[in-house]
Swiss-Prot record:
Residues 134-231 bind DNA. SMART domains: REC, Trans_reg_C. The keyword Cytoplasm applies. It comes from Bacteroides fragilis (strain YCH46). PROSITE patterns: OMPR_PHOB, RESPONSE_REGULATORY. This is Transcriptional regulatory protein RprY. Gene3D superfamilies: 3.40.50.2300, 6.10.250.690, Winged helix-like DNA-binding domain superfamily/Winged helix DNA-binding domain. Residues 9-123 form the Response regulatory domain.
Length: 236
């Protein structure tokens, strides 16, 4: 969990030395603590030794690419926000980043102001989550703790990523009602552009897999509108 009273500590991995130094200096000037590493291997070693609040990874790096690095980081910490920087603009590459669990994806060239905006947008979501009281939802045979981001059924507990938790929380708040697609996108992703919409589709697929142990639960598409979480009404 990010401590808002401490200086935000960013793990920055970028193999372009000039760009990396510019990014580090700019972020430090904005009040962040940014540590720069030239490849994914060095970045992961630093991640294991130190505590970071947010990661910014270039995709194409030597020794270990950004996608592989993100997967390893996610395995160790499902909550830490990750932003990808890349020159890749193919839809397949961008979707691959979101499948891994990226919180945002910025294509090069980009402005320093844009990166700062994306970081601040993520922080607003974290602050909002931190300020909310814990809600525990009963979803069929599942119990979902929004604060701990844990989905449980019987003795099985699944730790959800931040975006999985946020999206499932919205679906639970609108259980058996239509969750409007635009509302969900602007609430969680800030922007309802094409790539964010595809990212949300990926997370819906992940949530369906998490919920597959209870046949009474279903997330259905409502064409042109959004999604609906079908779940038995809780017993009174």
């Amino acid at each position: 969990m990010i401590d808002m009273d401490e200086k935000l500590r960013i793990l920055l991995c970028e193999d372009d030395e000039n760009l990396g130094m510019l990014l580090r200096e700019y972020l430090q000037a904005k009040g962040y603590s940014a540590e720069l590493y030239p490849d994914g291997e060095a970045g992961f070693k630093a991640f294991l030794k130190n505590k970071y609040d947010l990661c910014v990874f270039d995709v194409m790096m030597p020794k270990k690419d950004g996608f592989t690095l993100a997967q390893e980081v996610r395995a160790a910490n499902a909550e830490i926000p990750i932003i990808f920087l890349t020159a890749k603009t193919l839809k397949e590459d961008i979707l691959e980043g979101f499948k891994i669990g990226a919180d945002d994806y910025i294509t090069k060239p980009f402005s320093m102001e844009e990166l700062t905006f994306r970081i601040e947008a993520i922080l607003r979501r974290v602050r909002g989550k931190k300020n909310k009281e814990s809600n525990v939802y009963k979803i069929g045979k599942f119990t979902f703790d929004t604060q701990k981001q844990i989905l449980a059924i019987g003795d099985k507990q699944t730790k959800l990523t931040t975006k999985e938790s946020e999206l499932l929380g919205l679906l639970c708040a609108h259980a058996n009602e239509i969750l409007q697609r635009d509302f969900a996108l602007k609430t969680i992703w800030i922007d309802d552009n094409y790539f964010n919409a595809r990212s949300m589709d990926v997370y819906i697929t992940k949530l369906r897999k998490h919920l597959k142990d209870d046949d009474s639960i279903e997330i259905i598409n409502i064409h042109g509108k959004g999604y609906k979480l079908i779940t038995p009404e809780p017993e009174s």
